[in-house]
Amino acid sequence: MFSALAYYLLIYPASLLPLRLMYFFTDFFYLLLISILPYRRKVVRKNLKNSFPEKSEKERRKIERKFYRHLTDLLAEGAKNLSISKKNLKKRFRVENPEVMEELYKKKKSVLLVSGHYNNWEWMITSQNLLFPHQAVGIGMPLSNGFWDKKLNERRARFGMKIIHSKITHDFFKKNKDIIATLVLADQSPGDSNRCYWTSFLNQKTGVLFGPEMLANEYDQAVVYFNIKKVRRGYYSIHLHEITDNPSQLTYGQITEKHTQLLEETIKEEPAFWLWSHKRWKRQVPENLDALRESHEKKFNERFR
């Protein structure tokens, strides 16, 4: 009941305001975040220190402040996403090199679009079906709050994206007849330390979701990394990087290593725009990592090679 009241009486009406006015309110919230209400400050500082040990404390604090500024911008833009028009969204969210996806579509090649929680990923989800010729697909886990899960997915899907539960991903792919582009944010902390792919990421041993590589090989889909760049406040551009259009030609781990490396390069270029408040490194590195990797590689090769 409270969620519905908050949505209909506060959040959705606020989304109808001009974005410039919404930024005025989130600017005030930014001042609260860096002073009175330090949201996950310990997590942010720990992540920055471990990721950039070569930077001085002053440099990391500068990134931290810029991150919180960006985070409050995302609050305004996230609210705006509930009501933003197709025309306005297309004006604010552009693709630098759409020919990458256009060529894959001509080949009737479905695509896994892979990146991380960098810049405004929510606008990417909402606008994807407007940007590329492929049918947009999003994979996600339902939110614990049923009302918000329904409302957010309605907003995300209103321009044509199909939202599917992660548990039915394989059923969906097996039955699918469309040329699709499935968006995957692969920088989330994995649910199981023993089932993910371990590599080096931002100066730390990191467990990475292996799902994109498995899906690419299982269903012979191309893999494209997308980098969302902040042009200016409220405006973004996307640069596409094709990793492969033939995953069977690559060896175990190559796809995962490549999209992880590309995300790291993206973050290092403009560190403040990644989601530093996320507990990315909460999983412990397995003690038998070498044996585990050997076992995973063997199973992968038996299945796909």
Predicted regions span which residues?
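Amphipathic coiled-coil/heptad-repeat helices and related helical stalk/stem segments
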Residues: 97, 121, 148, 165-169, ...
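Catalytic core of membrane glycerolipid acyltransferases/transacylases, capturing the structured
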Residues: 107-167, 191-197
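A broad structural signal for alpha-helix termini and local helix breaks/kinks
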Residues: 17, 36-37, 51-53, 132, ...
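Membrane-anchoring hydrophobic helices of lipid-metabolizing enzymes
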Residues: 1-115, 150-155, 160, 304-305
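Hydrophobic (often cysteine-bearing) scaffold residues that line and stabilize catalytic clefts
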Residues: 60, 144, 148, 255
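A conditional alpha-helix N-cap/helix-loop micro-motif detector
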Residues: 91-94, 118, 145, 165-166, ...
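Conserved beta-strand termini and adjacent loop/short-helix elements that scaffold enzyme active sites
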Residues: 98, 139-141, 164-167, 241-243, ...
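Non-catalytic C-terminal accessory region of glycerolipid acyltransferases
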Residues: 62-65, 103-105, 130, 170-305
